[in-house]
Design a protein with these regions (language model features):
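Conserved class I S-adenosyl-L-methionine
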Residues: 113-118
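A short, Lys/Arg-enriched interface patch at domain edges and termini
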Residues: 52-75
């Protein structure tokens, strides 16, 4: 007898992969790569017994597979690559400024234990504060799912993620699914569209069948979105695609293994920032709102479509879905009013606003929607304001190279009377008490 009480004489491949807790494709990959000698019948079928299983276990290091060394070993053996949170192109991404932001907070803010990143994008700045309790939020579901993957506290199986990524990379299909029907030979080749559609459908099915939890679901979707973005026939966004191109790059998913030591009280939201601010409280509110009229839901409509997987009708040359509910007030003439309401409702000790000096340096679409004098007027009513600057070259949708582009940090130390007033009016989740 062996674990589970299954007799060796009656073993089949299903019994073996269940005992080893690996996929069938990975089992055969391991046998082939390591030249593991397993007896075969005249028809080529493997004979499985206790000795064979123990031999394979030694190659797997099965008992310690969650350890980093063994995880790295498995990734290497399967010929996979690992990606990290900063490996994604994104408009306004602050990864290059993360050290500047963290240093500013560490040197000027006291008692910061809870950080709210309410326009979190793909999480570059939130990651800088991963030693704190994090509250992240973004209006785009594709960003919410990425933040959940990286920051929410939920156990997941590294081995399961690695094996599924390996399996997805082996997929070869020409099925006429939603992606192929709507996006073939636009942002991706027809075959890659089929592959994207197949993988996304499989992730959805596995979650609905409870084969993966929501953390694993989020990790797999984020890996797929990152892989798409890496090969997309664009200039970094999805407002348009280049015509008459050869699709040389093929879809390859990388492994994402978020840290499991994040704060157990972290929470990620997918809400309008001005609505969410009324029901949360923290020590530091970090703000990185859209600066100009370019809507993020327009620039990333395809990734948002795949993340949501509601399969809506698409239209126009760029094959966009309806994005009415995803439009941000911060990209319109309402930006200043929205910003003022957000600041008035903020219940924190400090507010840190990232805003560059583009108010009059770019074209009409690039120009900042909120003027410096309005920023100072609004923040000064809330507390004492100090400005910090850093030179910065941003990733944008345009081709212009604007000189003397600076990222400014407006740090507002909230007046004590403001803090007292807000504390009495804020609805706070249970874990804040």
């Amino acid at each position: 007898m062996w674990q589970g009480g299954i007799k060796m004489a009656s073993l089949n491949v299903t019994d073996v992969i269940k005992e080893l807790d690996i996929s069938k494709s990975y089992l055969y990959k391991l046998i082939d790569k390591e030249n593991i000698l397993i007896p075969r019948s005249d028809t080529g079928r493997y004979f499985w017994d206790e000795n064979t299983v123990e031999i394979i276990k030694r190659f797997l290091h099965i008992d310690g597979l969650q350890d980093k060394d063994d995880t790295d070993f498995l990734i290497s053996k399967l010929g996979l690559k690992q990606s990290f949170i900063n490996n994604r192109r994104y408009l306004g991404n602050k990864y290059s400024l993360s050290d500047f932001i963290r240093k500013t907070v560490d040197e000027n803010c006291k008692g910061v234990n809870i950080v709210i990143d309410i326009f979190s994008g793909t999480g570059a700045v939130a990651n800088t504060f991963k030693d704190k309790m994090l509250i992240t939020n973004d209006l785009l579901y594709s960003n919410y799912i990425s933040n959940y993957a990286w920051f929410e506290y939920e156990k997941y199986s590294s081995k399961k993620i690695i094996e599924l990524i390996y399996d997805y990379n082996q997929v070869k299909t020409k099925e006429n699914n939603y992606m192929r029907e709507n996006f073939a030979d636009t942002f991706f080749s027809a075959d890659d569209c089929s592959k994207i559609g197949y993988i996304r459908e499989d992730i959805e099915a596995k979650y609905k069948n409870k084969e993966i939890n929501f953390k694993e679901y989020a990790i797999l979707i984020t890996s797929l979105l990152n892989a798409m973005d890496k090969i997309a026939n664009t200039v970094g966004h999805y407002d348009a695609y280049r015509k008459n191109v050869d699709f040389e790059k093929k879809l390859v998913l990388n492994v994402l293994l978020p840290e499991e030591t994040v704060n157990s009280n972290n929470i990620c939201y997918n809400l309008d920032a001005n609505k969410l601010i009324k029901s949360i409280r923290g020590d530091l509110l970090y703000l990185d709102p859209p600066y100009n009229s370019r809507q993020y839901c327009d620039a990333y409509h395809l990734l948002e479509n795949v993340a949501r997987w509601e399969k809506p009708e698409v239209y126009g040359v760029a094959r966009k879905m309806d994005r009415t509910s995803l439009k941000s007030d911060y990209c319109m003439i309402t930006a200043t009013k929205a910003f003022e309401e957000l600041i008035e409702r903020a219940d924190t000790k400090y507010i840190l606003l990232s805003y560059n000096n583009m108010s009059d340096k770019g074209n009409d679409r690039s120009n900042a929607k909120i003027l410096d004098e309005d920023i100072m007027r609004i923040l000064s009513k809330k507390g004492k304001v100090t400005i910090f600057e850093s030179n910065y070259k941003s990733f944008s949708t345009g081709k212009s190279d604007i000189k003397d582009n600076k990222e400014r940090l407006f740090l507002c130390e909230v007046f004590s009377e403001e803090k007292k007033k807000m504390t009495s009016n804020t609805i706070v989740p249970f874990f804040f008490w």
